Amino acid sequence: MAYNDLRDWIAALDRAGELKKIRTQADPILEIAEITDRVSKSRSARYGQGGPALLFQNIKGHPGSQLLINQFGSARRMNLALEVNSLEQVAERIRGFMDVKSPQGFLDKVKMLPMLAEMGKFFPKTVPTGPCKEVVKRDNFSLLDFPILQCWPKDSGRFITLPCVITRDPRTGKRNVGMYRMQVYDERTTGMHWQRQKVAAEHYRDAIRNAATSTAHVGTAALGGPAGQSPAATTAVDIMAKTSGASVPAEGAYPSGKMEVAVAIGTEPALTFSAIVPAPPEVEEFLIAGFLRQSPVELVKCETVDLDVPAHAEIVLEGYVNLDELRSEGPFGDHTGFYSLEDQYPVFHVTCVTHRKDPIYATTIVGTPPMEDGWMGKAVERIFLPLMKLTIPELVDINLPLEGVFHNLVIVSIRKSYPGQARKVMNAIWSLGQAMFTKCILVVDEDVDVHNLGEVTLKVLNNIDPERDIQFTLGPVDSLDHASRLPNYGSKMGIDATRKWASEGFTRPWPDEITMDATTKSLVDAKWKSLAKDLGIE
């Protein structure tokens, strides 16, 4: 049965022995982050088990508040979050839906009815009200009432780090739920870290184009018109609105040059996880969450903006971003293990806060791995492998090592059947959504275990001729890549570590790998139990 809300999830963690309640006073400025970092890198975490989820119940400056962190910080908790014994179960369900063929006749259509009925259960549904409306504050509110963390010494302030940020495509009306950090500037404003390749940033650019062609709120001045235009407005267009191609037709323009935004904090785990998944463009994250939890997400209307939010969220922030306003955001200690640099981003103005009575603030900390976000990334890797195979059918397995921080290294094994196939796979990966940011791709043969980094290292270094097998290309890179020649643009490397064929220009014989013959292995197998005991290596 799906978790109804964050509190159901916390109770499940407690029952499973995966939660530790911390009653010792801890400061949201740096101290809670340091405690969590030590837990994330504890002995159990290093051996792949992950430290426990933490519920802080005595937070300095916030009497009576509770804070949940590291809720996804182990493989077991990711399984618990999605209510499966193994993430392969989710992948198998995805494969099942992908295997559905177009019906060829009446009988085929009848056979599809149960599948269609099941899919219908996942769509979100709007309800009149929900727990997130237990307290409604249209004024007399402050973001600083919540125990928002400053995680690292050189962070530019407190950051909301686990939000579900809800926007709407001004062209199509489709909703998006994304996870973007939010620097708290004061009691009622935050930054919106919408990196330019993200969906919400595209919504923002579309809103600017619409407003520029259909209203006077942005108009020619915002597009570099008369002198006296505010630097913020000019910068907003320069950084966020410049795209190739013609302007979008004026439709669905936002009134007064504003774009409405809502933020849900403390949602049930499937929805929180859905905010980070690389969803196909036509699929809403609310639907993905319904699929993962096997039950629809309940939504309620906001009080001050025309958006729907999760009815069972602990906290909801409603508001808008001005289309001509940017503000300095960062530095921020990021998942790369380095501080992401200060830059200009849109500003979120909060118009209303709703929350549950005694809301539980859910957050996370990112930094040098292993940390909580790494386990979430590994779940994405496992669950979405079947979708990658739709585009790359020769793909056998994939590994995004934690040390590669998701976008620096991808290791794939392939079923090779023609010359140059490894390079084809590299280019296919660089064309797949967020995988376009991958800095380095290693391609190995299907018999290599991509999750065994020792085996991968051995095969890669033995199988390559560097000049022949390393490919360089240029393209988009992650905004957090501090080493690229330019922001958002740099080089990538692909390494073909597959066995080389004569049809690929390799004229020498390829040697056999060293393995013991089956007869000898059987003889030793019969003696091994006794030998191992004598040798003390059972």
Placement of each model-derived feature along the sequence:
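Intrinsic disorder/low-complexity segments
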Residues: 212-256
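Extended, highly charged
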Residues: 1-211, 255-332, 336-538
